[in-house]
Amino acid sequence: MDLYEYQARQMFKERGVPVLDYRLASTPDEAREGARELLAEGASLLVVKAQVKTGGRGKAGGVKLAHTADEAYEKAQAILGLNIKGHIVKKVMIASGADIAAEYYFSILLDRSNRRHLAMCSR
């Protein structure tokens, strides 16, 4: 499966896995409106994230924090159109932020040469 982050979140949500709320935006104005909604619902921190099917978004400038709707607009404006490893950012996800102590990456891959699934986790 080759999914954008927002698609994976939606699948988790539909199956009862708790996920932080988010909005999807194709323009800075949509990002500002989505941020306003999340802030009105109680979010105190927002994360504006490039939606591209590649890793390294944060290092490439595709993940930025915002505290206000206007900041979310500015961050979305900077991210939309960005080229991340050959992928042009056409959408951003504005998500409620969380206070995290540690971050992990988890993936299940198909190892075609051995005809098995491979679980990978890193910190």
How should each PLM-predicted stretch be described?
Residues 40-47, 63-89:
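Active-site cofactor/substrate anionic-group-binding motifs, chiefly glycine-
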Residues 5-12, 41-58, 86-99, 106:
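ATP-grasp fold ATP-binding core
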Residues 65-68, 96-100, 110:
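Short beta-strand-to-loop capping motifs
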Residues 20, 29, 71, 79-85, ...:
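Non-catalytic terminal accessory/regulatory regions of metabolic enzymes
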Residues 10-14, 71-78, 105-108:
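Alpha-helical scaffold segments in soluble metabolic enzymes
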Residues 1-37, 41-44:
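A conserved helix-loop-beta module that forms one wall/lid of the active-site cleft
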Residues 19-22, 48-75, 105:
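Glycine-rich phosphate-binding loop of ATP-grasp-fold ATP-dependent ligases
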Residues 108-123:
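Flexible glycine-/small-residue-enriched beta->alpha junction loops
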